[in-house]
């Protein structure tokens, strides 16, 4: 999915407003995903998945860091996320549908924390961005 100049601007502006909360929002999105889509828990059998667990917070920070890197490389998502794509495809073997579920959970999290900034245009741009990230992360499954 190709991001327009307006999409890129919206994504950068929205992610900029996330600021120092990125790791917290990442953890919250994971918690939402685990609650809304319980089958996603199967990839984390060794995690304490309770609210506020250190393991969920730690993985939320990893998710947030990867997205921050992606936002910084909107013109080269495949290059920026190549190692992460390899990890998820070859080592972790995460079912690609889970990226869509996490993307949805992240959009809900961002909308709940940034209600005044989460306009329809920003929503659409973030959705396209997360779909692009998901596409890159699943590209090495083939």
Swiss-Prot record:
Q: Does the keyword NADP apply?
A: no
Domain (Globin) ranges: 2-142
Which residues of the sequence carry a binding annotation for O2?
59
GO terms for biological process, alphabetical = hydrogen peroxide catabolic process
Tissue specificity statement from the Swiss-Prot or TrEMBL entry? Red blood cells.
One term of GO molecular function: peroxidase activity
Signal peptide location:
none
Q: Does the keyword Transport apply?
A: yes
Q: Name one Pfam family in it.
A: Globin
Where does this protein hold heme b? 88
Keyword set, alphabetical order = Heme, Iron, Metal-binding, Oxygen transport, Transport
Give Gene Ontology CC terms: blood microparticle; haptoglobin-hemoglobin complex; hemoglobin complex
InterPro entries named in the record: Globin, Globin-like_sf, Globin/Proto, Hemoglobin_a-typ, Hemoglobin_oxygen_transport, Hemoglobin_pi
Q: How does it assemble?
A: Heterotetramer of two alpha chains and two beta chains.
Fetch the PANTHER family from UniProt. Answer: HEMOGLOBIN FAMILY MEMBER, HEMOGLOBIN SUBUNIT ALPHA
Regarding protein family, the annotation reads: Belongs to the globin family.
Q: What does this protein do?
A: Involved in oxygen transport from the lung to the various peripheral tissues.
**Official protein name in the record:** Hemoglobin subunit alpha-4
